[in-house]
């Protein structure tokens, strides 16, 4: 016996969409009893407290600001970080940070059409607890929390997250040049990163969509300080 609505969703079938809209308008929740039972069994959270303010959270915030996205759904939020299949150290570390902070493993999937790897996590109030808005952030002016800015260790972890997501380290033997670059199209985020790196004692130059540390001794020192691309085997 075939199922008439197999393969359809409320977005792709008019009858399903109408039913969904009617249930939403009448505030009918088909899954309430199931959800309440799962909460009683401890399989679904019933509360979503503030996140522990520590180095792991500081680093994850940097990753999300650099290469992450928070999306608002009807009943929850989703956090997605995009990594590279050729840089699995970043993927594994990002997934571990999500688990460390939220206590739940994210879904890690390879994109079929590219080397991209999605690290995806669903839960209520992600945006509120991270204090990062949902949607696009091209011009978003992030207000760095005091628990990061006034703590050197947390500042370093925050910068590590940003550089792991959007940083590049290069050395040209031909020209004897060294470059440690952070790239981003958000001018407010670039200025924040430049200010924090200068505050740690490094010389920074600014240009379109990137900031750069280029003194040989400083490049290696900054790379070592934030443990750039250093992953546990």
Task: Give residue spans per PLM region.
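Internal intein/HINT superfamily modules and their associated LAGLIDADG
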Residues: 1-233
């Amino acid at each position: 016996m075939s199922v008439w609505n197999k393969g359809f969703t409320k977005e792709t079938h008019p009858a399903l969409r109408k039913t969904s809209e009617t249930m939403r308008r009448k505030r009918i929740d088909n899954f309430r009893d199931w959800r309440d039972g799962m909460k009683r069994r401890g399989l679904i959270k019933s509360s979503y407290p503030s996140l522990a303010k520590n180095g792991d959270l500081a680093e994850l915030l940097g990753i999300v600001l650099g290469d992450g996205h928070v999306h608002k759904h009807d009943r929850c939020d989703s956090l997605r970080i995009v990594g590279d299949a050729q840089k699995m150290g970043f993927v594994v570390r990002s997934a571990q940070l999500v688990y460390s902070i939220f206590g739940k493993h994210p879904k890690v999937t390879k994109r079929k059409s590219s080397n991209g790897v999605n690290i995806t996590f669903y839960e209520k109030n992600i945006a509120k607890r991270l204090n990062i808005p949902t949607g696009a952030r091209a011009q978003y002016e992030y207000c760095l929390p005091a628990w990061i800015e006034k703590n050197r260790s947390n500042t370093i972890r925050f910068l590590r997250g940003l550089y792991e997501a959007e940083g590049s380290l290069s050395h040209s033997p031909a020209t004897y040049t060294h470059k440690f670059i952070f790239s981003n199209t958000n001018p407010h985020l670039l200025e924040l990163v430049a200010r924090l790196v200068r505050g740690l004692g490094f010389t920074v130059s600014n240009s379109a969509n990137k900031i750069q540390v280029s003194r040989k001794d400083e490049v290696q020192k900054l790379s070592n300080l934030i443990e750039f691309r250093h992953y546990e085997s």
